[in-house]
């Protein structure tokens, strides 16, 4: 995978400490039940708030998980682009010929020990059902 915060020497330790502090001060208790090796998918649902991302990142760092995520390509434009990639982001253009499932499977099969987080709703809006492509993954 590409260069991320997870493999930036020195920075990762400070970020883990900051994430632990943020979670502790907000009353969160994180229990580690994640696998320690191999590739797997994290289903981040429901994704209904802008706080989902920073809290998810904080939990991943606290648990020492090198998590990657797929996000809408517009999140990766401008000055936010390099930051989102550095945090483990993989852009997805929903209008392109390749769909979400194909892109996810390609990323997943081309990388050993990949932890991929996705929001199956595909939006922060409240929805009655998840997008059906998620079930094929």
State what each model feature region is:
Residues 14-18, 22, 80-83:
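Hydrophobic alpha-helical segments of integral membrane proteins
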Residues 3-8, 25-137:
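Soluble catalytic domains of membrane acyltransferases
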Residues 8-9, 14:
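N-terminal membrane topogenic signal
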